[in-house]
Amino acid sequence: SILAHARGRAERCLILGVAALDGMRLGPFKAVLAHEYGHFSNRDTAGGEFALPVRRSLLTMGEGIARGGAATWYNPAWLFVNGFYRVFLRISQGASRLQEVLADRWAALSYGSRAFEEGLRHVVAREVRFGAHASATLDEVITAKRPLENLYSYKPERPPIERGVEVSVQEALEAKPSPYDSHPSPVDRFAWVRAMGAPGTGASAGDDAEAWSLFPDRDAIERAMTAVVRRNVAQANGIEIAGAAPPGRLDS
């Protein structure tokens, strides 16, 4: 509730992307988590419910004007809504970028500048790679009407072209900043944490272990998340994907 948020007693929920864990070392993983907990420590989530409703209201109002055919340069209502939305977005997103910088600082101080940069690079790259893998996999299983038990370990017959994926990863890492971005550009964030030169107070000898070593049953987690993906595809597109092949069917 709003009252619970104001009192700082609301329950916080941290969502961890399973695909990001693939190939991630424990040290960078801890640094990325420290970034998220940095938001909690700075109470960044306390006022998050205020900016988003304002943004949604402005968008709804603008869409209503546009659908009514009144989104013209001479309509003062449209000019006001459009202009106010842009100003509001610049201010609110600017505040969001500052929150990200301060959370980065917590992460670097806790586990080291190098660990956080490695973790952030990994997360950016995995978002691109997993997006390409998921698209290829879902296109294949939907077209061929195949079951999908584990999205993460599935090997599509036509995997994404590696060169194209590499280019996309590099573009994501070197993306130019915009005043409407909620996060600073990765390049800027790398430069800032490097300038700190923080060794990290929480680094330990076991930081080279795989992040997946923290979880006892990787396959069960991946299958559970695949079930969520299948359900979301069904709800959004009306396409049912089986979770397992029918008895006696051996094709993948």
What are these regions (language model features)?
Residues 69-96, 101, 105, 109, ...:
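Cytosolic-facing loops and C-terminal tails of multi-pass membrane proteins
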Residues 26, 30, 53-62, 159-164:
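Noncatalytic linker/hinge segments flanking ATPase motor cores
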